[in-house]
Amino acid sequence: MAKGTAKGAAKRGKIKAEEPASPADASPRLPAGRHGLPREFITQNQRERIITALVDTVAERGYNATTVAHITKAASVSRRTFYEHFADKEACFLAAYEMVADHIRASMGAAAKSFGEWPQQVRAALATMLRFLASEPELARLCMVEPVAAGGEIAARHRATMQDFVRILKAGRPEHSGERPLPEATEETLVGGIVSLIVREISAGRSAELEKLLPDLVELILSPYLGTEEAERLARTDAAPTAD
C-alpha cells in the first residue's frame, strides 16, 4: 500500500475499489462558527467523521451495543447531521463495510494478477487479505466478526461478499478438479471453514497473528484440487504476493 494506513482511509471513507491507497488516520474537526468552507467540503468531512466514529465505537462496544448517540458523540456531530448522511445505524455500518470490502477485493485481485497460475493466484490473494486484516484489527472485526452478530441486511451483504471468494475457487475447477468431479458444495465449505478460522482468531484478540494461518489455509483450500502433496508444497512456498 501507499503511505498512510488502510484503517485511517477506510474510517474516513477514502477506500475505493480502484484506489486502495490511503491517507493519514486523523479526521480534522471543523472550527466552530463561520468558517467559510464550501458546503461540499463540510459535508464530506462530516461523513468521514461519522464513519470514523462508527468504526471506533463498534470496535469498542460491538455493533449491537452501539447506538446513534454513541456515534454522534464520538464524531462530534448532531443527530440531525447524522441523519442527513445516513438513514440509520445500519446504513452507516454498511457504508463502512462496503468500503473495506471493496478495498480487500481490489487488493486481492491486484495480488492475484502477479501470478499466471491459478494455485499461486489463490495463495497470493489469501496472503494479501490476511496481511490487511492483521494490520487493521478494528477493520478486521468490522468486516469479519460484526456482520454475523448484526444480522439482517448486514449479514446478507456479508454472505454476498463471501460469494466472491467462492467464485475465485470455482475458477480452478476446470483444470484442477481431477478425474472425479468435486462435490458442488466444495467451495462453499472451504470458504466457510476459512472464514470460521479467521473469525476465531479475531474474536480471541489475535488479529495480529492472522498471517501465521497462511500455510494451513492454502493447504486446506488447494488440497481438493491439487492433492495433498502438491497443496502442501505450494502452501510452504515462500512466493511473495504483491503488497496490498
Predicted features and spans:
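Short, structured motif recognition centered on aromatic/hydrophobic residues
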Residues: Y63, I104, L139-C143, I194, ...
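Helix-turn-helix
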Residues: T57-A91, A95
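Amphipathic alpha-helical packing segments from all-alpha helical-bundle domains
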Residues: G152-E175, E184-S196, K212-L220
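Basic, helix-initiating cap at the start of DNA-binding domains
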Residues: A2-R61, V68-A74
